[in-house]
């Protein structure tokens, strides 16, 4: 798939809404789709509505999809903030490759999703690339390798971002990333903090609520670029547990951080 220039995701998983379906209360039937070994090449649109893959919608975001997305190659997607937009529960994203994109792998809605074993190289020279962004509770990100993520250089996109939610969030809003687990990831030579806790959407003025019970453990962060020697950045009100992470900056020996 490549050179799609009009609105709408390249590939969509839609869930069937039975008669009388109530968004946010009902769930649609499972889908069990397997998306694998595809190439998603150059496309550009705007900052919203041009994803390569979208799994569900906010209307069906409480659906347990049980979809598996693996061994896909994503390259040179421009402007759009979300390369993959997850919008349902119980999906797995593994062993995918992301090269020179402007966006991120985003758990936009849904819970109990796993993102692991993926490779990200954000080098493009456009200073827009992101890595993995977590919204909504009970999601797990582990054993990913991310390098050259450029979005922390003025565009508030980081290798791993854990977002605040909204107070009384609507279904299509932002729920806090409570109980997120970020474990055993490697971040190499990226701008800004490697792990940013408490990211907000500045365009949404509704009061924010910080995520709780976030676990960050066993990650390795190595940096020899930029002028920011902070491996992670967090807001004071977040409940978190940070243990056994390793950090090396500008030649300083690898050390454990608490």
Task: Name every feature range the model reports, one short phrase each.
Residues 1-257:
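Glycine- and acidic/polar-rich repeat regions and solenoidal domains
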């Amino acid at each position: 798939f490549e050179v799609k220039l009009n609105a709408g995701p390249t590939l969509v998983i839609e869930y069937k809404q039975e008669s009388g379906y109530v968004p946010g209360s009902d769930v649609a039937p499972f889908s069990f789709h397997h998306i694998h070994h595809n190439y998603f090449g150059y496309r550009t649109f705007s900052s919203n509505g041009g994803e390569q893959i979208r799994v569900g919608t906010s209307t069906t975001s409480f659906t347990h999809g049980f979809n598996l997305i693996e061994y896909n190659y994503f390259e040179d997607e421009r402007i759009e903030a979300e390369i993959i937009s997850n919008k349902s529960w119980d999906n797995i994203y593994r062993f995918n490759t992301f090269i020179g994109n402007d966006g991120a792998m985003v758990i936009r809605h849904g819970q109990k999703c796993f993102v692991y074993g993926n490779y990200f190289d954000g080098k493009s020279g456009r200073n827009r690339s992101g890595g993995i962004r977590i919204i909504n509770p009970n999601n797990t990100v582990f054993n990913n390798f991310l390098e050259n993520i450029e979005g922390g250089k003025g565009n508030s996109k980081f290798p791993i971002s854990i977002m605040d939610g909204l107070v009384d969030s609507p279904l299509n809003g932002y729920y806090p990333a409570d109980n997120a687990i970020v474990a055993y990831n490697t971040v190499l030579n990226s701008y800004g903090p490697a792990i940013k806790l408490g990211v907000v959407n500045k365009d949404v003025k509704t009061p924010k609520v910080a995520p709780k019970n976030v676990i960050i453990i066993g990650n390795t962060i190595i940096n020899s670029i930029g002028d920011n020697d902070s491996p992670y950045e967090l807001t004071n009100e977040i409940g978190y547990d940070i243990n056994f992470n390793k950090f090396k900056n500008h030649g300083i020996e690898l050390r454990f951080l608490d």
